[in-house]
Amino acid sequence: MLKTLSLHACAAAFVLTASGAMAAPADDAKAHFQAIGSGDLTTLMSSYAANTQFNWVGGPLDGTYASAEAIRGVWEKFTKSQGPLKVTMDKLEESTNPKGSTVSANVQFEGKAPIKVRYVLTFREGKIVSETWQIDPKLAMAAAY
């Protein structure tokens, strides 16, 4: 009886630990956006896979970046020039299959001026492998309450 109870307790602890260890891609995307807003480079860089491709479309940082060093350089320039930003998200959607997940969202970063971005992140094995930051000044955002 005690052995059976111990096995059930161990199994329950394993399930709780395993399920708590992996956040949903939508949650990871939200954390990524918040890290951008707060300028937290450590959190930002820890979310990338080794072979991430980052496409920044529009604005002074326009380009494709394909190494951790290049991506860090972009975020260093951006966070230095912008400072802390208020982050507003709208229309966040997640698509998942066994090979990975894609999260898309309308995101507004607001500091010196509002920066409206159509964001697309692709995750594989819990890490970002593709990131697209599309600046879109006409992007519609839901009204904040």
Q: What function would you assign to each model-found segment?
A:
Residues 69-113:
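Surface-exposed, charged secondary-structure patches
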Residues 40-55:
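Short, well-ordered alpha-helical segments enriched in acidic and aromatic residues
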Residues 53-66:
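A short gly/proline-enriched turn/hairpin at secondary-structure junctions
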Residues 10-16:
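Hydrophobic helical h-region of N-terminal Sec-dependent signal peptides
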